[in-house]
Every structure is written in C-alpha cells, then in structure tokens.
C-alpha cells in the first residue's frame, strides 16, 4: 500500500509523540531535580498510547488490518478505556494541585501531571479514532471478521 502524505504525517506525528512521552517518563523518573512519579506515569502512558497509534498506522500500511478486524475493535476499546483513565487522572491531579496550593512553574507540581494526562487523553482519543476509521474502511470484508 502506498503511503499518502497525510498518512506519512500521521506516522511522523505518532513517532514524535512516542519519543516525547518516553522522554518525559525518563526525565521525571530518573532526574533527581524533577522526580515526580505522577508526571512520569502520565508521560509514560502518553508515550505508550502514541506508540500504539504508530503501530496502528504501520499495520495499516502493511495491510495487516484487512485480515484482523477484531484487533481494530480491541484497539478501539483500549483507546476508550485509556481516555476514561486519562480524564480521571486529569481531574485528580488538578484537584490535588489546587488543594495543595502548588505553583504552576514548579517542575514537581501536579499541574505538569495534568498536562501529561491531557496529552494521554489526546493520544487515547486518536488511537480510538484511527481504529474506528480503519475498521470502517475494511468493514466491507465482513467474511474475514470471524478470524
């Protein structure tokens, strides 16, 4: 399958998102000045979801989804599940940051965890959206959906 310009941009965007998420995970996990487990977890989740979106696009380019539509349903479910988890995390970190009167500029504050939870929400939504679109594209092959 030929890679269109839009698909190439989606591949590059997902790859950059995975790199940014994993770099946030390692920064807030390993650097003593920035050590904040909540931000590391939210950044790591963002990186994993971006990687799943990248894998979704790569499998689309390789035409793998045509024979495994149930996998797209699974990716859609995972995207919805992590969207809900990201919203809960965003609200929780926002409430914690407000009740503890944390500074917006502090790298250890829960406000950064809110930002990374929102980015995780974005990647979970995009994972669901791409899985839904690719599933609709291959829905005409309903005979193979039992595999």
UniProtKB/Swiss-Prot annotation:
Q: Name one GO biological process term.
A: heme transport
Quote the gene name from the UniProt entry. SLC48A1
Signal peptide limits: none
The task this protein performs is described as:
Heme transporter that regulates intracellular heme availability through the endosomal or lysosomal compartment. In macrophages of the reticuloendothelial system, is the heme transporter for heme-iron recycling. Essential for macrophage iron homeostasis, transports heme from the phagolysosome to the cytoplasm during erythrophagocytosis (EP).
Q: How does it sit in the membrane?
A: Multi-pass membrane protein
Subcellular locations according to the entry: Endosome membrane; Lysosome membrane; Cytoplasmic vesicle, Phagosome membrane
Catalyzes what? heme b(in) = heme b(out)
Locate the transmembrane regions by residue number: 11-31, 41-61, 74-94, 111-131
The entry's protein name is Heme transporter HRG1
Protein family per UniProt = Belongs to the HRG family.
Keyword annotations: Cytoplasmic vesicle, Endosome, Lysosome, Membrane, Transmembrane, Transmembrane helix, Transport
Q: Where is this motif: Di-leucine motif?
A: 143-144
**Coiled-coil annotation: which residues?**
none
Gene Ontology cellular-component terms listed: endosome membrane; lysosomal membrane; phagocytic vesicle membrane; plasma membrane
Q: Offer one Pfam family short name for this entry.
A: HRG
Give an example GO molecular function. Answer: heme transmembrane transporter activity
């Amino acid at each position: 399958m030929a890679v269109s310009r839009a698909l190439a941009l989606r591949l590059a965007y997902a790859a950059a998102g995975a790199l940014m998420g994993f770099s946030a995970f390692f920064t807030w996990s390993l650097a003593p000045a920035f050590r904040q487990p909540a931000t590391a977890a939210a950044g790591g989740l963002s990186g994993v979801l971006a990687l799943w979106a990248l894998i979704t696009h790569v499998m689309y380019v390789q035409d793998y989804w045509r024979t495994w539509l149930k996998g797209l349903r699974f990716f859609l479910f995972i995207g919805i599940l992590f969207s809900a988890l990201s919203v809960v995390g965003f609200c929780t970190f926002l409430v914690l940051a407000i009740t503890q009167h944390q500074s917006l500029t502090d790298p250890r504050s829960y406000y950064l965890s809110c930002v990374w939870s929102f980015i995780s929400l974005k990647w979970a939504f995009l994972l669901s959206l791409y899985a839904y679109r690719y599933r609709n594209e291959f829905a005409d092959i309903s005979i193979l959906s039992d595999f």
